[in-house]
Amino acid sequence: MAIPILDALTSSSGKKNSAEFSIHSTSNPTNPEEPNITSEADNAEDLAALGYKQEFQRGLSLFSVFSVSFSLLGLLPSVATTLPYSIGYTGTPGLLWGWLIAMVFIICIALSMAELCSAMPTSGGLYYAAAVLAPEGWGPLAAWFTGWSNYIAQLVGGPSINYSTAAMLLGAVNIGNPNYEVQNYQLFLVSIAIQFIHFILASMPTKYIAKLNSVGTYLNTLFLFISMIVILAMSSKNHGFNETSKVWSHIENYTDWPDGFAILMSFCGVIWTMSGYDAPFHMSEETANASVNAPRGIILTAAIGGIMGWVMQIVIAYTVVDQTAVVTGSDSMWATYLSQCLPKRAALGILSLTIVSSFLMGQSNLIASSRIAYSYARDGVLPYSEWVATVNPITKTPIRAVFVNFVIGVLILFLAFAGAITIGAVFSVTAIAAFTAFVAPVAMRVFFVKDADFRTGPFNLGKFSKPIGFCSVSFVALMIPILCFPSVKNPTPAEMNWTCLVFGAPMLAVLIWYAISGRKWFKGPRINLASEGDNSTLEGVELYTGSEELPQKKEKE
């Protein structure tokens, strides 16, 4: 139940009563606008009030957790990968206006997510929030739907990034040796090799992960600026820049749909690029002062990523020589674009920087996705949850969850042998699955929970919470069907957009699983709702009374 749950969360049994302690408010009593810098014990106590014991080391600072999510955006490789959407539908106006308009709503989603993260800083993230905020009787189903949508996005996102990295790596070989032809098995093997390296890196102790991702953030930012400077300098020297009026207003519609609808379709590029800024939410149990730093990480990632990404789009729009050749060419759009505006060696150099950034992006994805797997397994959602939900006593990281995601990623990569259409359809699901999960708990907050009954954390939107949340939900509700449209009205199988099938089929499968079996044993996240002398169980969640043993999934009835 949404309202009683929110009240009960602030009166958990233990050392402090509800008048003294609330997990949803850690403001400084002398200055309510200035949050306290909480201690390790305070972080653990906040987490215990959410129903979980502290198992990770809180070794991530604000910059560290921002580094994970910013690296996961991978602006340089993401912009390169999404050119078929951003410029491939409406030309340069799609690059510029598409990114700018969509970012307004993406920032709204980030703000709404950050507010929930501040109130409920747990690795379960969106899945946990959906259960707590859902109306009476719907908590378990809301958590199940949100959790699986988010997990599917993460599972598919990692292999898609690594496959793109492998394709760019072998494409660089092709630039050096034009007679070289890339084979599917080579893409598969290189992708697996990259994924295995990520498995090793994501299993390291948190302090090393923090350092690695900090370095990754610096490199991603540096490489992005180097790429923009080189492209601008070479273009200015060789062929000049495109006219401003043409760049901003001359629509080259490469679809069968009206210009306005085609611009909306171009939003796919920025939506795919920005589908990783929820990572701080899932890393909150490893973050110091999580109710403050994790939401800040979400907002910083969305804002800085959005601005820097748009600047990169402006650079491309003003320097592309022949956008029709880029869109209709048989080679990679990014490679074609670079070859137009740069000499061969410079193009190869920028492509190399893109490959390194893409590698770091994939590594961040596995870190975030493994924490999601761990949090879901801890609540009994995944098969063999008892085995998966284990933190290695030496590294203090969920190595088994990392391994599970690595294996599933390898299985997904086998689809590369089925051809470009199949593997492309699988990978296109990342954006729609991620943003469906992003707004599910926001919708619960907007439509089912009154402001007076929602106890905010140090970061909150105040009276703007519901208006911003409504904008977030409306945007995603509009974009979901648009992202499923093909670019032509009468598509062949090769031209069809299979996103609706690739996302719909597994989601339908997990919903059927819930109807047949899951509803009998899955009661939502296990949270500590009982105050002293009160053993009542609230619907929509499963009571966990603080046993030292890890809660296990109930036996199937």
Swiss-Prot record:
Pfam families: AA_permease_2 (PF13520). Gene3D superfamilies: Amino acid/polyamine transporter I (1.20.1740.10). The chain crosses the membrane at residues 60-80, 94-114, 214-234, 261-281, 297-317, 348-368, 407-427, 468-488, 498-518. One of its GO terms (cellular component) is cytoplasm. Residues 17-38 are annotated as: Disordered. It is a multi-pass membrane protein. The keyword DNA repair does not apply. It is found in: Membrane. GO terms for biological process: amino acid transmembrane transport; gamma-aminobutyric acid transport. One of its GO terms (molecular function) is gamma-aminobutyric acid transmembrane transporter activity. The keyword Transmembrane helix applies. Keywords: Amino-acid transport, Membrane, Transmembrane, Transmembrane helix, Transport. Belongs to the amino acid-polyamine-organocation (APC) superfamily. PANTHER family: AMINO ACID PERMEASE, AMINO-ACID PERMEASE BAT1. This is Uncharacterized amino-acid permease C74.04. It comes from Schizosaccharomyces pombe (strain 972 / ATCC 24843). The lineage of its organism: Eukaryota, Fungi, Dikarya, Ascomycota, Taphrinomycotina.
